[in-house]
Amino acid sequence: LVRIIQSFFMIPDVPARPNLFSSDGAKWSSIGGYLPMFSMAGVIAFAKAKRKHWSVKLIIICMICAFIPILNSAFYTFNSSYYARWFYMPILIMAMMTAQALDDRSIRFKSGIAICGGVMAAMAVIAILPKKTTDGDIAWFEFANYPAYFAVVLIISIAGLLLLYFIDRLRRKGRSFMTAALVSTVTACVACTSSVVYFGVTLGSYPATY
């Protein structure tokens, strides 16, 4: 459950290598719904401003299905393994909600940015919690399976949120922001994809081959 939440607010884990939260039964489940730079800030802002919009109701239904295994399995003939490849459907809806929120100057991103920042801060706190090693010793900053990768993911996610805050300030001041939003979004997409691909290769069995 927590891994699903994390994957929508931060860059998702590399397939088959859960990082902060282990899930042996869902390593290849394609859990992920993060929108580069925007995270869930645009979705939250849109939902707050237009609570009766059809997309808000649809996303709530999708969230319920994602959290309840039997409803989630209905998307792939009630298979016993947890898969989340159907997430691409609500992700497209959330991208639309984010775009509409960005285009409508009356919608403020402040609450969405604050909530996303709070979730990222909570994940950072969890990552530094002490962990008992196989020798019985207590180790700090090793709660994540791959601490270095988690640190990079967290930094990129926070940087995206800071860019979004800057763009929202331009919007509130009535200044042109679309070019800045486009460049920032493309940069965030490249950074997010590069981080996943790079660590997917370096953490593999034969990194030299790639």
Residue ranges: model-predicted function:
Residues 1-52, 72-76, 83, 130-149:
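Periplasmic/ER-lumenal interhelical loops and adjacent helix-loop junctions
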